Amino acid sequence: MEFSVKSGSPEKQRSACIVVGVYEPRRLSGIAEQLDKISEGYISNLLRRGDLEGKPGQMLLLHHVPNVLSERVLLVGCGKERELDERQYKQIITKTINTLNETGSMEAVCFLTELHVKGRDTYWKVRQAVETTNSSLYCFDALKTRKGETRRPLRKLVFNVPTRRELTLGERAIEHGMAVSSGMHLCRDVANMPPNICNPAYLASQARQLAEIHENLHVSTVGEEQMAKLGMNSYLAVGRASANESIMTVMEYKGAVDSTEKPIVLIGKGLTFDSGGISLKPGEAMDEMKYDMGGAAGVIGTMKAICEMKLPINVVGILAGCENMPSGNAYRPGDILTTLSGQTVEVLNTDAEGRLVLCDVLTYVERFDPELVIDTATLTGACVIALGKHASGLFSSHNPLAHELLNAGEQSGDRAWRMPLWDEYQDMLDSPFADMTNLGGRPAGAITAACFLSRFAKKYNWAHLDVAGTAWNSGANKGSTGRPVPILTQFLINRAGVELGE
């Protein structure tokens, strides 16, 4: 898909289609008014007849509008002008792209980026249009023998900006939007792969492929033998019953002018399949446990995005690859594990395994002397119950870091909601036999999981994103969403001091 920006009048555009907005009730946007004037009232006459009300997502495709050079004009319902917000804007873009794809318009000039969206500038509107377009066109058919093909797919989209001085802003928005989209695409591809293909070694191979393209990215791996020497007994216990070796992939991106600048560390939980182990999960929807590596998929996608943007920042990405299976060699409820930090954990449930992997990684990354650490994981079903599929759960022991992440979520549209991490919850992890248990009971499950992790993140500023509800969709639209790539990438853009809006 090719994107560009221009600034010009709609009637002068030579294109297969131009896209303009119509507000409710039957009120032309400024650009649509220009077309109506040049076509001597052709569009307003259609609206008076009731062909389009202007409700959000309504579409009306016109052919050969008088005095307009474009072959087609697509009128897009935008709802009430004062109510056009971020969510509605992205929904309109998605519906527009789907319609253009169906009409056979291989190229189009889109004027929807000139609509007024509350509190958002041209940069945001163009970038979100790029990301939304790419996301709506995504299709995972790598393993299908018959691939669905659109007869004449949309190949080129031009976004119009109000003035020529905003062209540079629009170009920057496209560049950033394409990088984020590229990262989301990789995240979705990796996460959607079946577990017989996507195992910890596959995660490592995907990281190496990325390093072959980008010279400032270096990839190394830590296998089970090295983990044993280090004392990562908790991580090793989880993967012990699997035929696939546990592999921790370390991705080091050096983009800062000062190579000694402290890195930001991103950790992604990479359970390529989670059966629950001895505490076996129910059979229903167990196939979706291939998505338990959604955190790792998000980290590798983010690393790709920052490589493409060449952000002037140092970042370490960790893919904590592992598989949780039952066998005679599996770890058991009742086992007590000594973690890399030296703290001991009583296992109450082998299906609370993600935290047992992450706790050793949180200790391991101390060697990088990090500026800060963010771990992201499809950690708890409790977070899905609490927040559903719209917001990721955010936990942090550092208020400024939490606020930065919340802000990045609002900017990118990949929102998070901060949850408490109060000391009162820590008592729920008490064990009579070890320093702690790996399960705090049914109440506040997402919080007690974060409390567990916080015990291993005392030596740096730390945040935890629980993406169990946001990393993938179930049902008819089953598949990876590409989250949390947008929020993590936006956070790093902000940290790198890259100029964005007007």
UniProtKB/Swiss-Prot annotation:
EC number(s) recorded for this UniProt protein: 3.4.11.1, 3.4.11.10
Residues reported in the UniProt entry to bind Mn(2+) 2: 269, 274, 292, 353
UniProt keyword Cell membrane present: no
Details of cofactor binding: Binds 2 manganese ions per subunit.
Cofactor: Mn(2+)
Keywords: Aminopeptidase, Cytoplasm, Hydrolase, Manganese, Metal-binding, Protease
PROSITE patterns listed in its UniProt record: CYTOSOL_AP (PS00631)
Catalytic center residues: 281, 355
Residue positions binding Mn(2+) 1: 274, 351, 353
Gene Ontology cellular component terms for the protein in this record: cytoplasm
InterPro entries: Leucine_aapep/pepB, Macro_dom-like, Peptidase_M17_C, Peptidase_M17_leu_NH2_pept, Peptidase_M17_N
Principal localisation: cytoplasm
Biological process terms in GO annotation: proteolysis
Subcellular location: Cytoplasm
Reactions listed under catalytic activity: Release of an N-terminal amino acid, Xaa-|-Yaa-, in which Xaa is preferably Leu, but may be other amino acids including Pro although not Arg or Lys, and Yaa may be Pro. Amino acid amides and methyl esters are also readily hydrolyzed, but rates on arylamides are exceedingly low; Release of an N-terminal amino acid, preferentially leucine, but not glutamic or aspartic acids
A molecular-function term among this protein's GO annotations: aminopeptidase activity
NCBIfam families per UniProt: PRK00913.1-1, PRK00913.1-4
Entry-linked PANTHER family: CYTOSOL AMINOPEPTIDASE, LEUCINE AMINOPEPTIDASE-RELATED
Family: Belongs to the peptidase M17 family.
Primary role: Presumably involved in the processing and regular turnover of intracellular proteins. Catalyzes the removal of unsubstituted N-terminal amino acids from various peptides.
Protein known as: Probable cytosol aminopeptidase 2
